[in-house]
Swiss-Prot record:
Residues 1-82 are cytoplasmic. Keywords: Cell projection, Cytoplasmic vesicle, Endosome, Golgi apparatus, Lysosome, Membrane, Signal-anchor, Transmembrane, Transmembrane helix. The chain crosses the membrane at residues 83-103. One of its GO terms (biological process) is apoptotic process. Pfam families: Calcyon (PF06387). Belongs to the NSG family. The keyword ATP-binding does not apply. The lineage of its organism: Eukaryota, Metazoa, Chordata, Craniata, Vertebrata. It is found in: Membrane; Golgi apparatus, trans-Golgi network membrane; Endosome membrane; Cell projection, Dendrite. One of its GO terms (molecular function) is clathrin light chain binding. Plays a role in the recycling mechanism in neurons of multiple receptors and acts at the level of early endosomes to promote sorting of receptors toward a recycling pathway. It comes from Gallus gallus (Chicken). This is Neuronal vesicle trafficking-associated protein 1. The gene is NSG1. It comes from the Eukaryota. InterPro entries: NSG.
Amino acid sequence: MVKLGNNFSEKSTKQPLLEDGFDTIPLITPLDVNQLQFPPPDKVVVKTKTEYEPDRKKGKFRTPKIAEFTISITEGVSERFKVTVLVLFALAFLTCVVFLVVYKVYKYDHTCPEGFVFKNNQCIPAGLENYYSEQDSNARGKFYTVINHYNLAKQTITRSVSPWMTVLSEEKLSEQETEAAEKSA
Protein backbone atom coordinates (compact mmCIF):
# COMPACT_ATOMS: atom_id res chain seq x y z
CA MET A 1 0.00 0.00 0.00
CA VAL A 2 1.05 3.52 -0.61
CA LYS A 3 0.57 6.38 1.77
CA LEU A 4 -1.14 9.35 0.20
CA GLY A 5 -0.02 12.88 0.62
CA ASN A 6 3.75 12.47 0.38
CA ASN A 7 5.81 14.30 -2.20
CA PHE A 8 9.14 13.52 -3.89
CA SER A 9 10.54 16.91 -3.09
CA GLU A 10 10.16 16.31 0.60
CA LYS A 11 12.89 14.12 1.94
CA SER A 12 12.11 12.78 5.29
CA THR A 13 14.78 11.69 7.67
CA LYS A 14 12.30 10.08 9.96
CA GLN A 15 11.90 6.42 10.43
CA PRO A 16 8.87 5.05 8.63
CA LEU A 17 5.88 4.61 10.82
CA LEU A 18 4.59 1.09 10.71
CA GLU A 19 1.68 1.70 12.99
CA ASP A 20 -0.78 2.65 10.26
CA GLY A 21 0.23 -0.25 7.91
CA PHE A 22 1.20 1.94 4.94
CA ASP A 23 4.57 2.15 3.23
CA THR A 24 6.11 5.56 2.96
CA ILE A 25 6.53 5.52 -0.84
CA PRO A 26 4.87 8.70 -2.09
CA LEU A 27 2.61 8.77 -5.14
CA ILE A 28 3.70 10.63 -8.23
CA THR A 29 2.02 13.95 -8.42
CA PRO A 30 0.01 14.64 -11.60
CA LEU A 31 1.71 16.60 -14.34
CA ASP A 32 0.72 20.09 -15.15
CA VAL A 33 -0.43 20.55 -18.77
CA ASN A 34 1.49 23.82 -19.02
CA GLN A 35 4.73 21.91 -18.50
CA LEU A 36 4.06 19.69 -21.56
CA GLN A 37 3.12 22.30 -24.16
CA PHE A 38 5.36 24.91 -25.64
CA PRO A 39 3.91 28.36 -25.87
CA PRO A 40 2.54 29.13 -29.35
CA PRO A 41 4.82 31.27 -31.51
CA ASP A 42 4.00 34.91 -31.94
CA LYS A 43 4.61 34.83 -35.71
CA VAL A 44 4.21 32.03 -38.24
CA VAL A 45 6.25 32.43 -41.44
CA VAL A 46 4.81 30.70 -44.52
CA LYS A 47 6.93 30.74 -47.67
CA THR A 48 5.04 30.93 -50.92
CA LYS A 49 6.12 29.81 -54.38
CA THR A 50 7.39 33.26 -55.26
CA GLU A 51 9.72 33.21 -52.29
CA TYR A 52 11.27 29.88 -53.47
CA GLU A 53 11.93 31.14 -57.01
CA PRO A 54 15.04 33.17 -56.06
CA ASP A 55 16.63 29.95 -54.74
CA ARG A 56 16.62 28.49 -58.27
CA LYS A 57 18.22 31.54 -59.77
CA LYS A 58 21.05 31.45 -57.25
CA GLY A 59 22.52 28.38 -58.97
CA LYS A 60 21.16 25.69 -56.72
CA PHE A 61 20.40 22.34 -58.37
CA ARG A 62 16.79 22.08 -59.36
CA THR A 63 15.06 18.78 -59.86
CA PRO A 64 13.84 18.28 -63.42
CA LYS A 65 10.20 17.73 -64.08
CA ILE A 66 9.27 14.19 -65.01
CA ALA A 67 7.06 15.33 -67.85
CA GLU A 68 10.11 16.75 -69.67
CA PHE A 69 11.69 13.28 -70.07
CA THR A 70 8.65 11.20 -70.99
CA ILE A 71 8.64 9.77 -74.49
CA SER A 72 5.42 8.28 -75.76
CA ILE A 73 5.75 5.78 -78.61
CA THR A 74 1.99 5.31 -78.76
CA GLU A 75 1.21 8.98 -79.23
CA GLY A 76 -0.76 9.50 -82.40
CA VAL A 77 -1.25 5.76 -82.96
CA SER A 78 -4.75 4.38 -83.31
CA GLU A 79 -6.20 1.85 -80.91
CA ARG A 80 -6.60 -0.63 -83.76
CA PHE A 81 -2.85 -0.59 -84.43
CA LYS A 82 -2.09 -1.07 -80.73
CA VAL A 83 -4.37 -4.11 -80.57
CA THR A 84 -2.86 -5.51 -83.78
CA VAL A 85 0.68 -5.24 -82.39
CA LEU A 86 -0.43 -6.84 -79.12
CA VAL A 87 -2.04 -9.76 -80.97
CA LEU A 88 1.08 -10.24 -83.12
CA PHE A 89 3.30 -10.37 -80.04
CA ALA A 90 0.95 -12.88 -78.41
CA LEU A 91 0.98 -15.08 -81.53
CA ALA A 92 4.77 -14.92 -81.74
CA PHE A 93 5.03 -15.96 -78.10
CA LEU A 94 2.59 -18.84 -78.55
CA THR A 95 4.46 -19.98 -81.66
CA CYS A 96 7.69 -20.10 -79.68
CA VAL A 97 6.00 -22.13 -76.96
CA VAL A 98 4.60 -24.60 -79.51
CA PHE A 99 8.00 -25.01 -81.18
CA LEU A 100 9.62 -25.59 -77.80
CA VAL A 101 7.08 -28.26 -76.89
CA VAL A 102 7.45 -29.98 -80.27
CA TYR A 103 11.24 -29.90 -79.97
CA LYS A 104 11.13 -31.39 -76.47
CA VAL A 105 8.74 -34.13 -77.58
CA TYR A 106 10.84 -34.93 -80.64
CA LYS A 107 14.13 -34.84 -78.76
CA TYR A 108 13.14 -36.65 -75.58
CA ASP A 109 10.46 -39.13 -76.69
CA HIS A 110 12.43 -42.40 -76.72
CA THR A 111 9.63 -44.88 -77.25
CA CYS A 112 9.98 -47.02 -80.36
CA PRO A 113 7.34 -49.19 -82.01
CA GLU A 114 7.40 -52.95 -81.68
CA GLY A 115 10.23 -54.52 -83.67
CA PHE A 116 12.45 -51.44 -83.41
CA VAL A 117 15.33 -50.66 -81.06
CA PHE A 118 16.34 -47.22 -79.76
CA LYS A 119 20.04 -46.68 -80.43
CA ASN A 120 22.07 -43.48 -80.89
CA ASN A 121 18.98 -41.27 -80.52
CA GLN A 122 17.16 -43.11 -83.33
CA CYS A 123 14.68 -45.94 -83.64
CA ILE A 124 16.19 -48.59 -85.92
CA PRO A 125 14.77 -51.95 -86.99
CA ALA A 126 15.81 -54.81 -84.75
CA GLY A 127 17.36 -56.64 -87.73
CA LEU A 128 19.70 -53.73 -88.44
CA GLU A 129 20.95 -53.43 -84.90
CA ASN A 130 24.15 -55.43 -85.55
CA TYR A 131 25.02 -53.54 -88.73
CA TYR A 132 24.17 -50.19 -87.24
CA SER A 133 26.39 -50.65 -84.19
CA GLU A 134 29.41 -51.50 -86.36
CA GLN A 135 29.40 -48.06 -87.95
CA ASP A 136 31.13 -45.05 -86.50
CA SER A 137 29.36 -41.80 -85.67
CA ASN A 138 29.52 -40.65 -89.31
CA ALA A 139 25.91 -40.02 -90.37
CA ARG A 140 26.56 -40.71 -94.06
CA GLY A 141 28.07 -44.09 -93.22
CA LYS A 142 25.05 -44.93 -91.10
CA PHE A 143 22.73 -44.06 -93.94
CA TYR A 144 24.57 -46.19 -96.50
CA THR A 145 24.79 -49.09 -94.06
CA VAL A 146 21.04 -49.02 -93.59
CA ILE A 147 20.44 -48.91 -97.36
CA ASN A 148 22.94 -51.69 -98.17
CA HIS A 149 21.56 -54.07 -95.58
CA TYR A 150 17.89 -53.23 -96.05
CA ASN A 151 16.98 -56.39 -97.97
CA LEU A 152 18.81 -58.66 -95.56
CA ALA A 153 17.22 -56.93 -92.56
CA LYS A 154 13.80 -57.08 -94.18
CA GLN A 155 14.09 -60.83 -94.52
CA THR A 156 15.33 -61.15 -90.94
CA ILE A 157 12.50 -59.02 -89.60
CA THR A 158 9.77 -60.88 -91.48
CA ARG A 159 11.06 -64.22 -90.30
CA SER A 160 11.40 -63.08 -86.71
CA VAL A 161 8.03 -61.35 -86.62
CA SER A 162 5.78 -64.18 -87.84
CA PRO A 163 6.48 -67.91 -87.44
CA TRP A 164 3.82 -68.61 -90.10
CA MET A 165 5.95 -67.07 -92.84
CA THR A 166 8.05 -70.22 -93.11
CA VAL A 167 4.94 -72.37 -93.39
CA LEU A 168 3.50 -70.15 -96.12
CA SER A 169 6.75 -70.14 -98.08
CA GLU A 170 6.94 -73.95 -97.84
CA GLU A 171 3.34 -74.20 -99.14
CA LYS A 172 4.22 -71.98 -102.09
CA LEU A 173 7.24 -74.15 -102.86
CA SER A 174 5.14 -77.30 -102.71
CA GLU A 175 2.52 -75.71 -105.01
CA GLN A 176 5.23 -74.73 -107.48
CA GLU A 177 6.63 -78.24 -107.40
CA THR A 178 3.18 -79.78 -108.02
CA GLU A 179 2.53 -77.36 -110.89
CA ALA A 180 5.90 -78.19 -112.40
CA ALA A 181 5.17 -81.92 -112.01
CA GLU A 182 1.75 -81.54 -113.68
CA LYS A 183 3.24 -79.65 -116.61
CA SER A 184 5.92 -82.24 -117.14
CA ALA A 185 3.43 -85.09 -116.99
